[in-house]
């Protein structure tokens, strides 16, 4: 295999459209959002379609999985890792407090009681939304359901006297026209591998590493098929007919790359 045959990815299950519609409908009742992105591809895992429903709301963009990523600091993005839970929790709560400071002062000036700010945690599938909420909640957290004006489909969890969070299912982009972007989203575990050609993903990953991170490749090779043959031989991946199992080699290579076995990287290099 030397070329990519896929043209685009159009994978948008019906339940995701319902989530889109629901969030758009509830935007007036949500005070702010936390968008979780992948630090290996913060721009590619940013969901501008969902963000457009909350243009005038306070936003925290949090890039997780920094333990897998090579990244540059960005004033608009808070970077962190769930593998450093205490540090991450402290940074997130401090940032959220600052984010709503002005609103809190406005309410105090009017002699109003401090309201509970409702934050929707959004992001693409498998970026770490639920894991973040599990980190932020206390053992005796209060799960609030059926609040006035809030659909039963959204459960609100109290993480502080002033903050309520709602975890939303991962929502994917409606359409991806550039197949290479789709491959990168597979390699960050956002897109299920079943919807793409896994060999093409492996070939893309090999060529990407060869261009940008040659030192991370486990074996030197002139071509992708040569790489898979070396991989299968070294790992002892042999079929019954004593043939090299290059299909299994491809799957293992992708799994190990996703899990960071070869080192930190960014998927936003040209």
Swiss-Prot record:
> Record-annotated residues binding GTP?
126-131, 170
Protein name per UniProt: Probable ribosome biogenesis GTPase A
Q: Which UniProt keywords apply?
A: Cytoplasm, GTP-binding, Hydrolase, Nucleotide-binding, Ribosome biogenesis
Q: What does this protein do?
A: Required for a late step of 50S ribosomal subunit assembly. Has GTPase activity. Binds to the 23S rRNA.
Q: One MF term in GO for this entry?
A: GTP binding
Cellular component, GO, one term: cytoplasm
Superkingdom of the source species: Bacteria
């Amino acid at each position: 295999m030397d070329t990519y045959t896929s043209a685009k990815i159009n994978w948008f299950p019906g339940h995701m459209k319902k989530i889109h519609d629901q969030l758009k409908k509830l935007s007036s009742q949500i005070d702010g959002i936390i968008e979780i992105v992948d630090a290996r591809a913060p721009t590619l895992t940013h969901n501008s379609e969902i963000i457009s429903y909350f243009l005038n709301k306070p936003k925290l963009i949090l890039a997780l999985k920094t333990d897998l990523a090579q990244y540059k600091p960005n004033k608009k993005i808070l970077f962190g890792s769930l593998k450093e839970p205490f540090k991450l929790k402290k940074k997130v709560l401090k940032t959220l407090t600052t984010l709503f400071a002005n609103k809190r002062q406005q309410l105090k000036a009017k002699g109003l009681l401090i309201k509970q700010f409702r934050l929707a945690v959004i992001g693409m599938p498998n970026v770490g939304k639920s894991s973040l909420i599990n980190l932020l909640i206390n053992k005796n957290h209060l799960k609030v359901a059926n609040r006035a004006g809030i659909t039963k489909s959204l459960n609100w969890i109290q993480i502080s006297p002033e903050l309520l969070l709602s975890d939303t299912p991962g929502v994917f982009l409606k359409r991806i026209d550039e197949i290479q972007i789709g491959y990168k989203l597979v390699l960050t575990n956002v897109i299920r591998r079943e919807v793409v050609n896994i060999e093409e993903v492996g070939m893309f990953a090999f060529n990407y590493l060869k261009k940008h991170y040659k030192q991370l490749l486990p074996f030197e090779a002139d071509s992708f098929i040569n790489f898979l043959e070396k991989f299968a031989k070294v790992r002892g991946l042999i079929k019954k007919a004593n043939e090299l199992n290059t299909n299994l080699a491809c799957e293992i290579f992708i799994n190990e790359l996703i899990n960071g076995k070869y080192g930190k990287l960014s998927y936003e290099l040209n």
